[in-house]
Amino acid sequence: MSDSKCDSQFYSVQVADSTFTVLKRYQQLKPIGSGAQGIVCAAFDTVLGINVAVKKLSRPFQNQTHAKRAYRELVLLKCVNHKNIISLLNVFTPQKSLEEFQDVYLVMELMDANLCQVIHMELDHERMSYLLYQMLCGIKHLHSAGIIHRDLKPSNIVVKSDCTLKILDFGLARTACTNFMMTPYVVTRYYRAPEVILGMGYKENVDIWSVGCIMGELVKGCVIFQGTDHIDQWNKVIEQLGTPSAEFMKKLQPTVRNYVENRPKYPGIKFEELFPDWIFPSESDRDKLKTSQARDLLSKMLVVDPDKRISVDEALRHPYITVWYDPAEAEAPPPQIYDAQLEEREHAIEEWKELIYKEVMDWEERSKNGVVKDQPSAQMQQ
């Protein structure tokens, strides 16, 4: 590590119950959110002259799950370069050696709001279809690199007032498993696909279910499947969409199948009743056409059996969405993930700590005078 990193580059400020020790270029820190992974502040970058988001990863080495997630997020943010995925602008640590290393700060673009705040606004079809199009483009880009999200929700999708949208994180690592019978834990399960809830195998269109739930919420202004735990989540889905076929039941593990088959049978509610005309914008004949297209898209995304659910590509070509189709956005070249073992890696905490430290040092090496190169996704040799 070069001697250029000295205390004079940093200052400390108290944010809620956490101390942020950040580079002096980042001023006017204001807390804007917190999650399982850490606290996020808005700040002004005096070098670039722009507002940014500074995220402090909370105790990234407290256990292997946190450490793996921190490493994965850092690697993916460095590799992914797409207009519908949040951009990483800087990475730093105030500590001067691996032995002292404790904190990781990620600096990203600052957006105006997350989708939770948009849900209570009345959106016209144009804005709604454009938001969904951008979501699908971002998801497709992640899929092209072998990243299946599995945990899309309004709180990790951010927007600007000009209706541009970006996905904030990379979801569950491939090795993260969800067991249907496990005790309830603190996680937003309302948007998770049946195959994730039921501990089945999954493929790319697992993320389409989440988009369907988010779209349904944008239309209705409230969560559409609001379960109190995993089991109740399943109940809420089948009460509205109906009990799935025997063919679907065969794909379940015996213990899960036994539970699912013993639930009361539900015929399901028609989509015209779940999403009636009056909850959509309807000022013109064109709106009426768009309403019927929007409902059709919902009916193809909110399908319990993933083998019968629409794919990301099919959703991008759906009449409700395809008006926005631009190959440069929908067919962008896949990101090159330089760590081929990213999803499968398992390490002791000290090894994770060293891997993350190397990533932070690599970023600092590639940054000149605190300003990152135009392409943070430039390839590294490992």
Swiss-Prot record:
It holds the Pfam family Pkinase. It is an enzyme of class 2 (transferase). The modification Phosphotyrosine is found at residue 185. Keywords: ATP-binding, Biological rhythms, Kinase, Nucleotide-binding, Phosphoprotein, Serine/threonine-protein kinase, Transferase. CDD domains: STKc_JNK. Its cofactor is Mg(2+). The modification Phosphothreonine is found at residue 183. Expressed in the neuroepithelium of developing brain at stages 16 to 26. It catalyses: L-seryl-[protein] + ATP = O-phospho-L-seryl-[protein] + ADP + H(+); L-threonyl-[protein] + ATP = O-phospho-L-threonyl-[protein] + ADP + H(+). Activated by threonine and tyrosine phosphorylation. The TXY motif contains the threonine and tyrosine residues whose phosphorylation activates the MAP kinases. PANTHER family: MITOGEN-ACTIVATED PROTEIN KINASE (PTHR24055). This is Mitogen-activated protein kinase 9. It comes from Gallus gallus (Chicken).
